[in-house]
């Protein structure tokens, strides 16, 4: 599913234009007060823009009409946040997911719940666990599984790496890759974790002062000089590669993981030394 925001005005944003590409991972990054979450709420139809066009798969929604079925749209666009509502803490995972399914008029289905949990790497034993006993990363996985249980075409993930260590980030990376490649999901990530974004995203929008500062291919964006006047961190691997280029005058293709970069350097050195024919 492709989503286009055309001349959207909402909050402090004026004439915002953005395209979320079908079956791709699009990242939206910016300072904490930049308005990323507002865009996430608009994309997931939880917040109605003041004006502009909201286009889904080339079908234009008239936002001025009162009969737009936002509830129907929420079947297709799932919004996942880190914080679990404290009112759900006493519920078991099964009770929580069953309630959420009922909100979307789905009948109780233990199989659907277990299948969704397995998609995010949680086994069936979790259905009897209370939300309050779960770790932050497990709660996020349950929130994601709950959203996946209604089978949305689009996933909007708000700050998904907030409570994750490096090993759990790697698991999330694999999960997002699975969602995109196997299940053909369109994924939006709102985050400032640029090291993670470099690994997982296809396309990036940078938000600064309630405007789009730059957007494009992840390598073009994260190596852009336009980021110098922002608080956005440059990924460590890009910092290293730029330092390597400055020291050696060797220009290599940008990579999103260390192993590929090391292979490129090794290949270049071997070729220069005559070790490769």
Identify the role of each PLM range.
Residues 191-192:
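H-loop/switch region of ABC-family ATPase nucleotide-binding domains
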Residues 61-78, 103:
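ABC ATPase NBD coupling module
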Residues 130-134:
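Conserved ABC ATPase signature
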Residues 44:
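Helix-to-loop junction immediately C-terminal to a conserved catalytic motif
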Residues 108-126:
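Conserved ABC ATPase "signature" region
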Residues 144:
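Hydrophobic anchor residue at the start of the ABC signature
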Residues 211-234:
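Conserved beta-strand-loop-alpha-helix hinge in the C-terminal portion
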